[in-house]
Amino acid sequence: MASAEATPQQQIDQLKVNAGWDMKSNIKAGLLHHEEMEKKATKTVTEYIEKFADVLEENVLRFLQDNAEMLELCIYMYEQLPAYKAVKSRGILSAKRFYDTYVLRTADGSCYESVSHCFMRIAAFCTVQVLTNSALKITILYLGRDKLFKDLPCSPTMDLFIYFFSPLSHQLVCCATPIMRSAGLRDANLASCFLINPDLSTEKSTTTALLQELTMLLSAKSGVGCNVTSFGVDEKCIQSCVGLINSQVEFFNDQNPRPVSVAAYMEVWHSQIQEFLAVKLPENPSRCASIYQGLCIPKLFFEKFIEDPGQNWYLFKPEKSGNLANLYGDEFRSEYERLVGIGCYADAIPIKSLMFLIINTIIKTGSPYIIYKEACNEHHWKNMEGCAIASANLCAEVIQYPGADVSTCNLANVCLPMCLVTVSNDSHSPLEKTYCGNVIESQAVSGVGFSMPILHAAVEVAVFLVNCAIAGGKCVTPGMERGQRERSMGIGVHGLADVFAEMGYSYLDERAARLDVEIFENMYFRAVKTSNNICRLGGGRPFEGWGESKLRHGFFHWQGWEDVNLSIPITEWEKLSRRCISSGVYNSQFIALMPTVGSSLLTGFSESYYPYFANISSKVSSKEEVMKPNMTFWNRVSKEDLDTVRFFSGDVALFPEPLKEKYSLFLSAFDYCAEKQLARARLRAPFVDQSQSHSFHLKEENVVSARFLKDLILSGYTLGLKTIMYYCKVKKQSTMSSFQCLRDQNKSEMTGNDQGVEPESYIKCTAAGGETSEACLHCQ
């Protein structure tokens, strides 16, 4: 059928064929999909109220009703801006994502929320929360912001609305999935993820924790990080415990458009650590395929492994483990040695054998995540002596201590490419009287700069947005309500690789490294400053637990790390320190670098702080597979290079030499040295007071040897990273796609070695057996 005679859907299907490499086709397909969906979407605020009044929270509904005329004008003016066209021009995958996942729809599916009204709903929710919280309201109005629509006569209430609507609708600030989908709805949970540390010491406490608390949390359609180290019920096997968790995950994922999961964490001294590592192995007939695993490894394990890989590592039953679970550092060592000395251990295993089991599990399943116990505790916002952290969340970037309560992940992220500007003569002039940084000019591309003032403004909005979500979200259990009193937040980023490429830097370039660290220093500075302003200017009460906070004494997270180079003048840090001591801060934590898969699909930019995953990849849903191009890359590909680039599927590492150099900025994460990526994570770590979802991106040849992974894990330990490994992904040699590390192990070639690992086996790469490469999209 000729294109002119085709239906819109047929045109979209035709265009999708080339969407992976032809940006005109990709953008046109997205625009057509928006056009088709807008036929079924709300056109006016009045219609929106009529269609969705029954699901909107009462105060949000009233706000929309009371301000309908001004909101209508605001939406109209926004839709005349280039920003609106840009949102609709992100490609077919972005368009699909909006309507399949994020916007509201009526129960019968006959009417959808328009994209503009989706942003309106979130901004209206935030405005309502600010109006009911005097500290937030006073602070925002005091700080002030230039109006987006300068000709629009606004009341203070509408000023507050525009304060949120502008960065949201421009996609400068992006929400985590629960906020994007549910802000402004009745009884909505807005937390991305939960952390629990349940008592699993008896049958009764285990069933109470897993069939009541965990069930309620999963019913909120979010992920959970669960510490299972206390499990030791009447000689029951950890397989049954994890199986109980796995069955619940599968139940909640049945017909659920947004999958949830649980990451079960265990400390490596547990007597059932070997059984725990086996619960997800492909050869396990009772394999728990729907959950994820994590290990909390203490400094002592690494020290002993390095000292003598052949020595024993002792394992303990929880009820005979003394106080190991609550200790770290020298106190952990003393307790461990005391227990070994009096013979309280249940078993012993050569430490190199346990390391090999860990690596074997990583190679076959892509996990367990690995967090470093001492780093998590020593760099926490308060002194953790006697109550150690031993787990993280579902994506391993949120580090909190839930105790008997429920810790929560309250997340948002900044789209870093939106901070790129054309450099002009006055680019270095600050936008406000207080410190907000300057525009950093590219040293490789003329006229391009990264605006720290825009970044500061974005982080400030993100702080208020997350606080609105904390205040206005439903707490699904009493433990969650108690945990939210710490007001922990996690502000992340996406599109860092695009920023580097636009500024002419390869990912591991020294100039990129400096900009990388400066970005996160400025983010941490502005987040703490804004949180302090809520107390200092708005009169807000500091979070519960402020008296124990290191910030109470003016001690910043970066001060606990060595070799930190600051770009912000020390006088600014000292001023902020004094203000924190004097007035307090509203939130306990600030920066967490999550994967941001969802946000990057909407904007078309790269995920999180990672290098590019691929220049052509795909996203598979229950409905279809849609190509995901690296739009920054394909917009650079010249017409004469197109055939060659397509022949090699956009894999720059395979290009012939002239083109490889020409497009060297677009190498993938698999092409960069994994150890150097870990070193970069260490450079930004002082300004990331939670953690980073740091994945290993490896090539097939890297994992034929257990030694390579062993060295990476030890490197993460040496660097002192909180999250040494979130996920391990391996790129198959034969395809453009990349896969997590599920492997078939065959043709065992056992060879002795003295490198501290078990004899190596030949490993054949296969695609991950139907699993997603990320644990959960709610964090992202």
Swiss-Prot record:
Enzyme class per UniProt: oxidoreductase
EC id: 1.17.4.1
Positions of disulphide bridges: 193-409
Binding locations of substrate: 177, 192-193, 223, 393-397, 595-599
GO molecular function term, any single one: ATP binding
Superkingdom as given in the UniProt entry: Viruses
Site (Important for hydrogen atom transfer): 193, 409
Function as written in the Swiss-Prot or TrEMBL entry: Ribonucleoside-diphosphate reductase holoenzyme provides the precursors necessary for viral DNA synthesis. Allows virus growth in non-dividing cells, as well as reactivation from latency in infected hosts. Catalyzes the biosynthesis of deoxyribonucleotides from the corresponding ribonucleotides.
Subunit structure: Heterotetramer composed of a homodimer of the large subunit (R1) and a homodimer of the small subunit (R2). Larger multisubunit protein complex are also active, composed of (R1)n(R2)n.
Family of this protein: Belongs to the ribonucleoside diphosphate reductase large chain family.
Protein name: Ribonucleoside-diphosphate reductase large subunit
